[in-house]
Amino acid sequence: MAKEKIVLAYSGGLDTSVAIQWLVESGYEVIACCLDVGEGKNLDFIKEKAITVGASESYTIDAKEEFAEDFALIALQAHAYYEGKYPLISALSRPLIAKKLVEVARQEGASAIAHGCTGKGNDQVRFEVAIHALAPDLKVVSPVRDWKWSREEEINYAKEHDIPVPIDLDNPFSIDQNLWGRSNECGVLENPWTTPPEAAYDLTVSLEDAPDTADIVEITFDAGIPISLNGENMSLANLILTLNEIAGKHGVGRIDHIENRLVGIKSREVYECPAAVTLITAHKELEDLTFVREVAHFKPIIEQKISETIYNGLWFSPLTEALVAFLKSTQKFVNGTIRVKLFKGHAIVEGRKSPNSLYDENLATYTSSDTFDQDAAVGFIKLWGLPTKVNAEVNSKVTITTEV
C-alpha cells in the first residue's frame, strides 16, 4: 500500500532535517521543498541533504524575483511597518512559501503539508492560514510543535539517526533572512535591557564602523516600482540586493523592537533592512511630490491596516485583496527619481524630480515670479473659518457655571 505523501517546508537546518526522519517514522513519504527568497541558500547542497536524510524527492526553487515583484513590492508601496517599526520581513515570505508548498503538493498528489515552526511564534499561524486559504482540503502537520522535544533531545535523535548536526548549532540566535531583510531573536536578545552584540548583525555595520564619507544614490520609479539604481536598470530583486550592500555598509536599517506577537506575547526582535528602509523612504518622498493632498492623507490609514493584515497571516484574504487594489490604484503617477544620501545609519532624501510633480515652484515661491493669487485667500479664510466663527458666536452667549 502506498504511503501518504506529505510536502515539508525544508530549510536544511536541524529542525526540518529531524522532521524528515520523524515524518518517515510516522508513516509518510516525505517530499522536501526549499525556496531561496534572497537569503543566498546553497540550493544544490540543501537538495542533496534532504534526500540523504530521508526525503523521497526534493524540490529547490529560486523564488527571489517572484518574492520581490509580488510580495516585497506590496510592502514597499504600502510603506509597511508593523507597529511603526517592523518592515514585515518574515511575514512577507511565508505566504509565498505556502503557495509553493501547495503547488508541489498538487503536483505530487500529496494529502498533507508540514512546516518546522514552533508553537509560540507567528509563522505557524501564517503558514497554516495561508495553506488553508489556498487548499482547504490539505492537512497541515507541525512536527516541531507536536514532538515538544528539548534542544538536547532533538540533537540526540539526530545523532541516533545519522542526521548531520549543523556546525553552527551553538549560534545563540534564531535568524530568518530574505532579500527584504534579516530578523534576529533569542539568546542574549531575550533580555530587553541587553545591548545587541555586533555578532547579532550581518547586513549592516555599526555607526562607529560606518565610513565617514556618504554614498549618494538615485532611485528611479515607474508607477511606484523601482526600476533603476544610479541610472542602471535592473530587476527589482537585484536592485534590492544591491541596495542592501550599499546602504548596509552605512549602517542603515538597524531596528531594535519590542513586538506584540499575534499569539499574544511580546518578543524582542532585532532587524536589519537597509534596502527596505531606503526604498520606503524614497518612495514616500515621491508620493509626497505626486499625490493630491486627500490621497496623501488617507493612504496611511490603508498602510497601517495592510501592515497588520499581512503580519497577522491574512495575505490570502478578501481584505488584503481589497487593500492592495486601493494601493495599486494610487501608483499610476508615482514616477520620478529620488536622490538619497546614505550616511551613518541615515537615509536622507536630498532631491526629488518627477514628470508628474504637483509641486509648482511659481506657486510656492516668495519672489517676484510668484503666481499665487493672494487676494483669493480672503474669501477662502471667511468660508473655511465660518463654522468656527458661528460656534464662537453661539456659545459665547451661553453662561457656563461651575459648581464647587
UniProtKB/Swiss-Prot annotation:
NCBIfam families assigned to the protein according to its UniProt record, in alphabetical order: argG, PRK00509.1
Organism listed in the record: Listeria monocytogenes serovar 1/2a (strain ATCC BAA-679 / EGD-e)
A Pfam family per the record: Arginosuc_synth
Regions annotated as coiled coil: none
Protein name: Argininosuccinate synthase
Cellular localization per UniProt: Cytoplasm
Listed CDD domains: ASS
Entry binding sites for L-citrulline: Y86, N122, R126, S174, S183, E259, Y271
Pathway where it operates: Amino-acid biosynthesis; L-arginine biosynthesis; L-arginine from L-ornithine and carbamoyl phosphate: step 2/3
InterPro entries: Arginosuc_syn_C, Arginosuc_syn_N, Arginosuc_synth, Arginosuc_synth_CS, Arginosuc_synth_type_1_subfam, AS_cat/multimer_dom_body, Rossmann-like_a/b/a_fold
Major localisation: cytoplasm
